[in-house]
């Protein structure tokens, strides 16, 4: 068999690798945007890699079409978030009537039965909004009041009509028990209300269609012989190529019936009906597509076994193409960079415009659009909000390799929708032209046109008859840190002073990166629906900081609660006593301390003086006693001497006296 060379020329890698062919850029732009779900950190995910090629082949190929139902605005499935909170109020009162009130919220475990019971109550209009119980304070005691509420919040989700699964950043669709799903918020569940009717999609006159090319792939086989090396080529199977879906191997498809029509489920999860004429290469085997297995035969996207590979119509090892290999390696690198960025965002809660481009969907269809929102109550903090949009590939004419478009240099229209040939202006995309009229050293003065894309209520239709609106597609906003620059969805920026639009991607941001693309912004993600409600309802006009709101859950805040005007006269007395002790308590303590210090000092001095006099008195008494003793002793000696003289005198008289003498 003669070798047939298939030359694949890379034109575009949609968002990831936009390459200019003539001066134009292919960009995945959001249309028909609606308010999206409340974003959480866990809901941020990296998009699916998506490659598109343009085929230049000398082999016979078949031209065909691929069609599918249009994504409908009714693909939103009604549902509710269900969670149980215990709102706790604690009052601690001291002996001198000083009170400290603490509020905190505890997320309780909730069962499926409790959720459905609360949903029935909600539909009857008897749902009670949560609140903190009134504090009950008792003298020299700590008292706690609790109130438990089962909360129900409406939360519509995007439904994948082909798989019947939910696509929502808050809900784990793989962890659902019928109509009861686990969410990524703590102790929070999602309840399905009703499934939408899919019969409206089955009218094929309203389906969207795109041209495709189908051809056989070839693989070169190297055979080493003793004297030489030869190459032969083996036909592997069918390849389908479209600038809308990229270059897809038939080995990656499986058969799936939708709307009672046979079609194929693609790797990105989309369903398409493939139509082609049976000529040339396919006349010899026009049933080759029917050899594919049904989607239920294997988990879609898993690696094929050898047995399954034998039953498929193509192989993954198409003819080696260095450009294609290089692009796949770059695609993997971009995906790794996105994962690293995502880890950094979750750890630091900081995000920049460049990060937005990594999160942007890479293929047409339903997807989320990300944009910054500055906190109205604290301009130093930002939120990341999302829109639920229908993405379409558009040609942006006269854009350079950096993604720049000078909107004053080229005449409008400058945009063409791929496959539909609809010519649009930038105003049709929702990007209003603005002028910076700010004088030197003056206050900011920016004037913009009123038209910012068609509204949902307008009768704006494309050439295929489908309605479209872009009033919220750009969602541009001005920030104090970046004067003269409007930052829109997915990192699209509008430099008003230079009149330059920039459509960012993960490849063209490597050139001349402006400082505002890399500036980190502190972003806040509400991780639980309770915080949304507190922020919206509980605080009212209070400009309480977001970080304080975080402390309301599983922690507490302290505040002194004085008696109000409706308290009785006993409460007023308590208030006065508390006020008195609060103001003079410190002074009284100081005075008492000084008095005690003075008294202690005086006592110490007196004791010291007494101790100083006591040793002298003791010495004098001892001396006196010694003198008396010596005097007595001397007297005794004198008396003895006198007696001796008496006896001597008597004896000397010649007469001796004897008492016994008769």
Curated annotation (Swiss-Prot):
Key words of the record: Clathrin-mediated endocytosis of virus by host, Disulfide bond, Fusion of virus membrane with host endosomal membrane, Fusion of virus membrane with host membrane, Glycoprotein, Host membrane, Host-virus interaction, Lipoprotein, Membrane, Palmitate, Signal, Transmembrane, Transmembrane helix, Viral attachment to host cell, Viral envelope protein, Viral penetration into host cytoplasm, Virion, Virus endocytosis by host, Virus entry into host cell
Membrane-crossing residue ranges in chain numbering: 580-605
An example Gene Ontology CC term for this record: virion membrane
Subcellular location field: Virion membrane; Host membrane
Signal peptide segment: 1-16
Post-translational modification: Glycosylated by host.
Homology family: Belongs to the vesiculovirus glycoprotein family.
Name under which the protein is recorded: Glycoprotein
Gene that specifies this protein: G
């Amino acid at each position: 068999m003669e070798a047939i060379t298939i030359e694949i020329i890379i034109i575009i890698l949609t968002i990831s690798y936009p390459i200019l062919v003539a001066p134009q850029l292919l960009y995945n732009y959001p249309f028909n945007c609606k308010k999206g779900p409340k974003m959480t950190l866990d809901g941020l995910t990296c998009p699916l890699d998506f490659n598109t090629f343009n085929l230049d082949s000398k082999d016979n190929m078949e031209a065909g079409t691929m069609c599918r139902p249009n994504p409908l605005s009714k693909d939103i499935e009604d549902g509710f978030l269900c969670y149980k909170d215990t709102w706790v109020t604690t009052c601690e009162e001291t002996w001198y009537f000083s009170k400290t009130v603490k509020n905190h919220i505890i997320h309780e475990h909730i069962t499926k039965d409790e959720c459905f019971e609360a949903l029935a109550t909600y539909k009857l209009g008897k749902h009670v909004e949560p609140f903190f119980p009134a504090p009950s304070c008792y003298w020299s005691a700590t008292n706690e009041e609790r109130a438990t509420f089962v909360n129900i919040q409406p939360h519509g989700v995007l439904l994948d009509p082909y798989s019947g699964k939910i696509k929502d950043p808050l809900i784990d669709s793989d962890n659902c028990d019928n109509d009861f799903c686990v969410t990524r918020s703590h102790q929070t569940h999602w309840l399905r209300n009703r499934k939408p009717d899919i019969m409206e999609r089955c009218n094929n006159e309203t389906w969207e269609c795109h041209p495709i090319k189908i051809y056989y792939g070839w693989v070169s086989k190297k055979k080493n012989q003793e004297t030489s090396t030869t190459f032969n080529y083996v036909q592997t199977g069918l390849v389908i190529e479209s600038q809308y879906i990229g270059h897809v191997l038939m080995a990656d498809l499986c058969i799936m019936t939708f709307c009672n029509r046979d079609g194929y489920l693609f790797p990105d999860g989309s369903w398409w009906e493939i139509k082609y004429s049976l000529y040339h290469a396919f006349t010899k085997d026009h049933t080759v597509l029917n050899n594919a297995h049904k989607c239920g035969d294997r988990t879609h996207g898993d690696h094929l076994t050898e047995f399954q590979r034998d039953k498929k119509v193509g192989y993954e090892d198409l003819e080696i193409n260095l450009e294609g290999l290089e692009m796949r390696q770059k695609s993997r690198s971009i995906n790794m960079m996105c994962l690293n960025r995502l880890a950094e965002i979750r750890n630091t809660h900081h995000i920049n415009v460049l990060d937005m481009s990594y999160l942007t969907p890479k293929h047409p269809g339903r997807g989320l659009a990300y944009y910054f929102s500055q906190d109205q109550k604290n301009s130093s903090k930002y939120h990341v909000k999302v829109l639920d949009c229908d993405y379409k590939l558009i040609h942006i004419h006269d854009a350079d390799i950096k993604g720049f478009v000078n909107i004053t240099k080229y005449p409008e229209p400058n945009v063409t929708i791929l496959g539909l040939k609809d010519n649009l202006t930038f105003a049709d995309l929702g990007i209003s032209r603005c002028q910076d009229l700010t004088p030197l050293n003056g206050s900011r003065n920016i004037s913009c046109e009123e038209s910012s894309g068609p509204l949902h209520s307008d009768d704006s239709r494309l050439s295929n008859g489908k309605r479209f609106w872009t009033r919220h597609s750009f969602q541009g906003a001005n920030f104090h840190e970046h004067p003269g620059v409007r930052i829109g969805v997915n990192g699209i920026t509008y430099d008003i002073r230079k009149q330059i639009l920039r459509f960012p991607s993960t490849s063209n941001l490597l050139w001349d990166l402006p400082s505002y693309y890399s500036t980190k912004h502190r972003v806040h993600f509400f991780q639980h629906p309770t915080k949304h409600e507190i922020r919206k309802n509980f605080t009212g006009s209070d400009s309480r900081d977001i970080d304080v709101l975080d402390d309301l859950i599983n922690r507490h805040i302290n505040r002194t609660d004085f008696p109000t005007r409706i308290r009785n006269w006993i409460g007023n007395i308590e208030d006065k006593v508390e006020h008195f002790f609060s103001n003079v308590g410190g002074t009284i303590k100081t005075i008492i301390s000084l008095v005690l210090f003075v008294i202690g000092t005086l006592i110490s001095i007196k004791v010291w003086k007494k101790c100083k006099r006591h040793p002298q008195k003791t010495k004098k008494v001892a001396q006196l006693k010694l003198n008396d003793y010596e005097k007595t002793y001397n007297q005794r000696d004198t008396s003895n001497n006198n007696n001796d003289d008496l006896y001597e005198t008597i004896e000397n008289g010649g007469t001796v006296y004897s008492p016994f003498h008769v």
